[in-house]
Amino acid sequence: VTTADIAYAKKMGLAIKLLATSKKIGDQYSIMVSPKMIGMSHPLFAVNDVFNAIFVKGNMLGDSMFYGSGAGKLPTASAVAGDIVEAAKVNGNTGHFWTEEKLALADVSTVENKFFVRTTAAAEEVKAVFGDVTVMNDVVANEISFVTEKMTEAAYKECAAKLNGIVSMI
């Protein structure tokens, strides 16, 4: 994430947050940590500085957020690195601590997301590849940005391969 990405997000009324997300998709689970753009109306938008939050959508509970002071950047980075190493050790197989049932993880390339893209390509080229997207061109000179419709990461990569000049993607 660059200062230009942050400037684009601000211009769109969004904030870029590093989120750990999990979602059940059929009989599999999508689990990832990645930067996401969050709108001002979302409770996570206001989480800043040393504070962390967990936002939960439950079928009975509805939307709930748990908010508090975090551990700081170095302890948190160490914990994340430890979690990644542990996940690699179990080769993608995880289980609940209260059951022996294994959880099937969804292939990240099959999970749908919207993608924020910056490029030096012309708006016409972008629309020819990604469809009728809204293009923003007044933040960084000689560059445009857009947000895709929901698509899988595999579909995004296929489209991105057809477009020259991609500067960044979130």
Q: Where are the regions that the model predicts?
A:
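Fold-independent oxyanion-binding glycine-rich loops
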Residues: T21, P35-M37, G58-M60, G68-S69, ...
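Generic "edge-of-domain/loop-turn" microfeature
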Residues: I38, L61-D63, E124, E153
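Active-site lining segments that contact anionic ligands and/or coordinate catalytic metals
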Residues: Q28-S30, F51-A53, L61, E112-F116, ...
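A conserved regulatory-domain signal marking ACT and ACT-like small-molecule sensing domains
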Residues: G82-I170
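Short, well-ordered strand-loop elements centered on a beta-strand within folded domains, enriched
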Residues: D27-P35, A46, D63-Y67, N164-M169
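Substrate-binding/catalytic subdomain of NAD(P)-dependent oxidoreductase enzymes
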Residues: V1-A46, F51-A53, G72
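ATP-dependent carboxylate/acyl-activation modules
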Residues: P43-T99, L105-T110
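Low-complexity, glycine/alanine/valine/leucine- and proline-rich hydrophobic stretches
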Residues: S34-N59, G70-L74, F130-A141, T148-K150
